[in-house]
């Protein structure tokens, strides 16, 4: 679509009007149809309505998200800390459009080709494949997956249960277009290669805690900050033996303790599998005062007291938060430079 919109060095205004008119007509004739744009020119607000003088697409294909995730996963585990920003960059623009996220054949090749790109043994490759699809389903945005016919029984069971997890928990989709539906817990754990975040609805008891470990190191007692006192029960784990994993799971519910971590008043210790994704349902303690999902206003930046290079940026969600803009620009430039270098090598 880039060539249609742009005529260097000017915008193709006639093409823009054509797309607006075309999308309006299609929507009137076929109300249930989905219009998805694939565009790499950073054209703004593709998914805003024609009534607001924009193009009126329903979704935009997030090729950048797929490319960044693959670049991160293809790196050797010991080198992934240098690519960690590519794992988290997407949340800096996640709410600028309505995005479709995909790990389909056209993006990553067949499952066999995808596995060949990943480092490690056969078992480690399988674990990373599960972690990649887990991160896809937990990340904000509409999902589109189309694995090829080479899917084995364990991976088929995994994808089935992952889809059931998504369908049965509104926090994973109800507020996809609202930044209040997402909150970082850990996103500066460069050395550990772990990300942790919350998916939320307006109901506190529907909160989901997701912890993703993209390193080959498993943990028996990994501490993570949590939003409130209460019980945290594991509802999904990519390392379940059912899926061909090692069985590093959290069989019992965890009670949050009053110990600061990740700039949260409460925290808990959990088992975290290597190359694994663990998902927890949250039950607030009785009498727990319901707090705002995301505090409004500026978020102070202070030096973190917890592991690695964590900083007090855990409450940041999108680039709309003014305190994040400078950091976001630095990350975008670094990742863009890395993408350009990778393209030059091809």
Task: Please tell me what each predicted stretch does.
Residues 2-145, 167-224, 228-239, 246-247:
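Conserved alpha/beta catalytic core and glycan-binding cleft of carbohydrate-active enzymes
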Residues 126, 137-340, 344-346:
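Carbohydrate-interacting/catalytic domains
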């Amino acid at each position: 679509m880039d060539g249609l919109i742009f005529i260097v060095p000017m915008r193709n205004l006639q093409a823009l009007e054509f797309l607006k008119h075309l999308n309006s007509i299609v929507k009137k004739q076929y109300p249930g149809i989905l219009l998805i744009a694939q565009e790499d020119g950073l054209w703004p607000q593709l998914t805003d309505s024609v009534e607001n003088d924009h193009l009126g697409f329903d979704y935009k294909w997030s090729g950048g998200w797929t490319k960044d995730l693959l670049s991160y996963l293809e790196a050797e585990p010991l080198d992934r800390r240098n690519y960690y920003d590519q794992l988290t960059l997407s949340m800096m623009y996640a709410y600028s459009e309505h995005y479709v996220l995909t790990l389909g054949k056209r993006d990553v090749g067949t499952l066999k080709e995808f596995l060949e790109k990943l480092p490690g043994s056969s078992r480690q490759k399988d674990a990373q494949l599960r972690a990649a699809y887990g991160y896809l389903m937990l990340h904000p945005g509409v999902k589109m997956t189309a694995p090829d016919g080479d899917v084995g029984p364990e991976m088929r069971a995994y994808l089935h249960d992952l889809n059931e997890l998504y369908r049965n928990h509104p926090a994973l989709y109800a507020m996809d277009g609202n930044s209040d539906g997402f909150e970082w817990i850990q996103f500066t754990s460069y050395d550990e290669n772990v990300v942790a975040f919350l998916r939320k609805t307006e109901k506190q008891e529907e909160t989901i805690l997701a912890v993703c470990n993209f390193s080959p190191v498993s943990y028996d007692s990994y501490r993570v900050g949590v939003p409130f006192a209460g019980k945290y029960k594991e509802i999904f784990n990519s390392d379940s033996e059912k899926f061909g994993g090692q069985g590093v799971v959290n069989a019992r519910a965890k009670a949050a303790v009053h110990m600061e971590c990740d700039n949260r008043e409460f925290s808990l210790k959990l088992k975290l599998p290597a190359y694994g994704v663990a998902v927890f349902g949250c039950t607030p303690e009785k009498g727990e005062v319901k707090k705002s999902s995301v505090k409004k206003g500026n978020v102070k930046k202070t030096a973190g007291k917890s592991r690695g290079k964590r900083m007090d940026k855990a409450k940041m969600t999108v680039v709309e938060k003014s305190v994040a803009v400078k950091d976001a620009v630095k990350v975008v430039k670094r990742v863009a430079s890395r993408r350009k270098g990778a393209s030059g090598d091809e």
